[in-house]
Amino acid sequence: MIQLRQLSDVIVKDKVVLLRLDLNIPQEGGKITDNTRIVRTIPTIKYLILHGAKVVIISHLGNPKGRIELTLSLRSVVTELEALLNIKVQFCPESIGSTPKNAIIKMKAGEVLLLENLRFNSGEELNDATFVNELSSLGDIYVNDAFSCSHRKHASICGLPAKLPSAAGFLLLSELKHLTSIFSNANKPFTVIIGGAKMSTKLDLLNSLITKADYLIVAGAMANIFLAMKRFNIGASLYKPELVNVASLILKKATSTNCKIILPFDAVIQNFNSNNITIIELNSSLVMQSNAKIMDIGPKTIAQIINIIKISKTIVWNGPVGAFEQLPFDHGSTYLSKAIAEKTRTGSLCSVAGGGDTISAIKKSGVIDDFSYISTGGGAFLEWLQGKTLPGVEALMQKLDTAKYI
């Protein structure tokens, strides 16, 4: 297990603690649709409040690319934080400069201040030294409780630990503990389900898991790459042609490692002109219309995957298998969620899921509490699965010593 300085190792009373959270949560029309990532960080915030810290929360929302976009203001999460903490949460409309400095000077021990979206400043994603210096000047101690952002070499993830006494929050430690334990002791058959639309990084994941997994179930836009490789006509379905050759190499590698790659063999498609929805077989004779897209896996594919779930001892899931946000394209993710949950409840399956969309899909199915472990990480979860050291975790490891900060 990775050793990191914990909150109990740091004296925070009357100190300004810069607390990095991941408040990049799904919203529709300014309303939060899934507060999981906030809920999981509440114990860390409450600990800091109880121990007399001045808690300054920093985070990002969306990808404004260094520009101010009011629709991506973190002001939208203040009410949710207040409801979960049952205290007043102050908001600062800037993240660096005199405005947050003056707001922090007025803070009392046990109070909470949320700064504006860090990504409104380009220095955050660039890990710019000037931005790091300005941000670090606001606090006395840095705490990282954003596991889901710890794969990024950004200012608030890697820059701040180099400037301030640093520690890991409860959520970050919990993620590392659970994921390390699960993957170091994975019982077989070991099944991995990979879906979603982020294709490039997930192909790397597939390539690394071929030697570990017994079954690799590929769905969503990821599967479209393999279907295109087989020269299936998939209409306007999302995929990246430049990744087809990589998919071919992965299939060949899987053959030599006895890893079975499972692709959809039927699908739910939608014609975007007529809005007609049909179920089709995926084969070499398929001719999809140019304005039609694959939106979900079909019933035969669902049945096949459920059969694999029934014989699996460990399952890792990242990425929905269809466009679950839109009815009726949630069927695949819902059926798989319920099948995994049902077997997990018997005690014969260890089930792990990670990624914002995956969490939302499982939550929508009503069975999220039945999974063995739900990781808040998306990209961080994927990199951890590949055995990579996360930059944010490495930055904390470099600050490890036995001294307490007073």
UniProtKB/Swiss-Prot annotation:
**What family is reported?**
Belongs to the phosphoglycerate kinase family.
According to UniProt, this protein's pathway is: Carbohydrate degradation; glycolysis; pyruvate from D-glyceraldehyde 3-phosphate: step 2/5
Name where it's found. Cytoplasm
Residue positions annotated to bind ATP are: K202, E325, G355, G356, D357, T358
Question: Which molecular function GO terms apply here?
Answer: ADP binding; ATP binding; phosphoglycerate kinase activity
Subunit structure, as described in the record? Monomer.
Matches recorded under Pfam families: PGK
Name under which the protein is recorded = Phosphoglycerate kinase
- Transmembrane spans: none
